[in-house]
């Protein structure tokens, strides 16, 4: 519904009715269905907001920071950080759909030529590069701003992000995901608009001497 005058709800939210509340007030029904978990959204909320809350209800963690002193880990490259509508990271779609949206993310283990389709494609849409730490690795995916859900992205190119499998969502100060971007550091925001690698923008090397560089 639209924003009303109820003082208890100031923004979209997910929640669950507690057993204590139900025992005191009885079951809450809507259209003959008992309500347990719920999502409150306003009719003027953006499509991105609707998608973010729906995906969270399906198990996807929010990726935005709750404390402003830490850099945003993902930004516009995943709808769970926002603010615009875009595809979730391929790793997110693999992990939080139980392998039903994305079956697997193969690892690059040797020098070779690899085909990487854009992130909206069902196959060959990501690769991972392992590190010495079994809980950390890098993921490569190709983002195409000609895709209907990604038209707001600044450009097309290769996106590289780090995954910490022992973290969950926007855990502070080290999050589960971190998208590498120009001038980015663990404590420096950098420029998320300049995250992609391509021959067109001149970022075509990812090494200890490049900007950004692969810190873990």
Predicted regions and their residues:
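Extracytoplasmic Ser/Thr/Pro-rich, glycosylation-prone low-complexity segments
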Residues: 49-50, 75, 173-216
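Active/binding-pocket-proximal capping segment
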Residues: 155-168, 174-186
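Extracellular hydrolytic enzyme modules, especially secreted metalloproteases
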Residues: 1-155, 161-168
């Amino acid at each position: 519904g639209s924003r009303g005058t109820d003082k208890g709800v100031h923004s979209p939210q997910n929640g669950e009715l507690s057993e204590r509340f139900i025992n005191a007030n009885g079951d809450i029904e809507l259209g003959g269905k008992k309500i347990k978990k719920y999502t409150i959204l306003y009719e003027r909320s953006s499509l991105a907001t609707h998608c973010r809350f729906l995906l969270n209800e399906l198990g996807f963690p929010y990726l935005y920071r709750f404390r402003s002193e830490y850099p945003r880990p993902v930004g516009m490259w995943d709808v769970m950080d926002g603010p615009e509508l875009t595809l979730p990271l391929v790793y997110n779609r693999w992990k939080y759909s139980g392998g039903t949206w994305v079956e697997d993310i193969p690892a690059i283990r040797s020098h070779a030529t690899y085909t990487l389709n854009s992130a909206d494609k069902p196959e060959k849409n990501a690769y991972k590069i392992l590190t010495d730490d079994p809980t950390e690795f890098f993921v490569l995916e190709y983002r195409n701003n000609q895709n209907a859900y990604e038209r707001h992205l600044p450009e097309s190119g290769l996106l590289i992000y780090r995954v910490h499998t022992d973290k969950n969502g926007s855990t502070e100060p080290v999050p589960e995901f971190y998208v590498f971007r120009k001038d980015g550091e663990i404590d420096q925001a950098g420029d998320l608009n300049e995250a992609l690698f391509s021959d067109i923008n001149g970022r075509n090397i990812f090494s200890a001497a490049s900007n950004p560089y692969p810190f873990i």
